[in-house]
């Protein structure tokens, strides 16, 4: 079990996280400044705060990126930050 505030273990993509990423796709495209029609969720970690931070590794047309998406306990998800230029084997860490 992950303690509050700590990053959890890495999980493979699942429907829940894919839906969260899809909900913020316009923001992702705006931050990356490129077409993300082929965006694919690879893996993710979570952090329990006053809601959940999702740290998500995605494959884009240009390589890989890490996303931080915040989802409150009740309400819509929002994109907080993007790290572009990542590699397939880069570990997901807090940013």
Swiss-Prot record:
GO terms for biological process: regulation of proteolysis. A motif (Secondary area of contact) lies at residues 47-51. It comes from the Eukaryota. Its main location: cytoplasm. It is found in: Cytoplasm. Keywords: Cytoplasm, Protease inhibitor, Thiol protease inhibitor. GO terms for cellular component: cytosol. Pfam families: Cystatin (PF00031). InterPro entries: Cystatin_dom (IPR000010), Cystatin_sf (IPR046350), Prot_inh_stefin (IPR001713). Belongs to the cystatin family. Intracellular thiol proteinase inhibitor. Inhibits cathepsin B, but not papain. This is Cystatin-A2. It comes from Dictyostelium discoideum (Social amoeba). The gene is cpiB.
């Amino acid at each position: 079990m992950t303690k509050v505030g700590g990053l959890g273990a890495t999980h493979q993509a699942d429907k829940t996280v894919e839906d969260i990423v899809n909900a913020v796709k316009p923001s992702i495209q705006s931050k990356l400044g490129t077409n993300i029609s082929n965006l694919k969720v690879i893996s993710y970690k979570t952090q329990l705060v006053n809601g959940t931070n999702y740290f998500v590794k995605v494959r884009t047309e240009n390589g890989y990126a890490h996303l931080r998406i915040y989802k409150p306990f009740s309400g819509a998800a929002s994109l907080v930050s993007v790290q572009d230029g990542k590699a397939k084997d880069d570990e997901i860490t807090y940013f």
